[in-house]
Amino acid sequence: MSQNATVNVDIKLGVNKFHVDEGHPHIILAENPDINEFHKLMKACPAGLYKQDDAGNIHFDSAGCLECGTCRVLCGNTILEQWQYPAGTFGIDFRYG
């Protein structure tokens, strides 16, 4: 494999099925999260759910969460107001075998 090969997360995650509980997100960010802590999550989240646009605004959407707990381990005591597994029948359904 070439050292310059990239992996498109969206394609890899596209085979999974997500059952989103729109009214009850399982991850809630603090009101004004520390930007340095947020940058940790931008780099570490395997689903790429933590993003910053060109204007510097930060964005997060728990709908594509893999429930791996990386954000909880890295920033659970700093910028996450809540992290819990989704209620029964909600969350990710891994379909890649």
Swiss-Prot record:
GO terms for molecular function: iron ion binding; iron-sulfur cluster binding. Gene3D superfamilies: 3.30.70.20. Keywords: Electron transport, Iron, Iron-sulfur, Metal-binding, Transport. InterPro entries: 4Fe4S_Fe_S_CS, Fd_FixX. It comes from the Bacteria. Signal peptide: none annotated. Belongs to the bacterial-type ferredoxin family. FixX subfamily. Could be a 3Fe-4S cluster-containing protein. Probably participates in a redox process with YdiQ, YdiR and YdiS. This is Ferredoxin-like protein YdiT.
